[in-house]
Every structure is written in C-alpha cells, then in structure tokens.
Amino acid sequence: MKRTYQPSKLVRARRHGFRARMATVGGRKVIANRRRQGRKKLSA
C-alpha cells in the first residue's frame, strides 16, 4: 500500500497557501485568528 503523504510544494501552496486562505470567508477567519495569536507563519 502506498503511503498517504506524497509531498508536493505546489499542491501544498494551492490548498493551504495564503491566496487559497484569502479566497474564502472561512480562510480569512483563519488568517485573522493566526494574526491575533501572533503566529510568525500565517499559512503554508
């Protein structure tokens, strides 16, 4: 059986990147919450 995690920088950026987060209301909330928490990295 193949492992489930097959890393790809492109897929990671498209699914969890900053622009992907900003595209939806929920994603914007995620960014806002992480900003409020003071995270150094806001998204993948």
From Swiss-Prot:
Entry-linked InterPro entries: Ribosomal_bL34, Ribosomal_bL34_CS
A Pfam family this chain is assigned to: Ribosomal_L34
Record keyword Ribosomal protein present: yes
Gene Ontology CC: ribonucleoprotein complex; ribosome
Gene Ontology MF terms in the entry: structural constituent of ribosome
PROSITE patterns referenced in this protein's UniProt entry, alphabetically: RIBOSOMAL_L34 (PS00784)
Any single biological process term in GO: translation
Stored HAMAP family: Ribosomal_bL34 (MF_00391)
UniProt xrefs under PANTHER family: LARGE RIBOSOMAL SUBUNIT PROTEIN BL34M, MITOCHONDRIAL RIBOSOMAL PROTEIN 34 FAMILY MEMBER
Family: Belongs to the bacterial ribosomal protein bL34 family.
Protein name: Large ribosomal subunit protein bL34
UniProt organism field: Paramagnetospirillum magneticum (strain ATCC 700264 / AMB-1)
Gene, per the UniProt record: rpmH
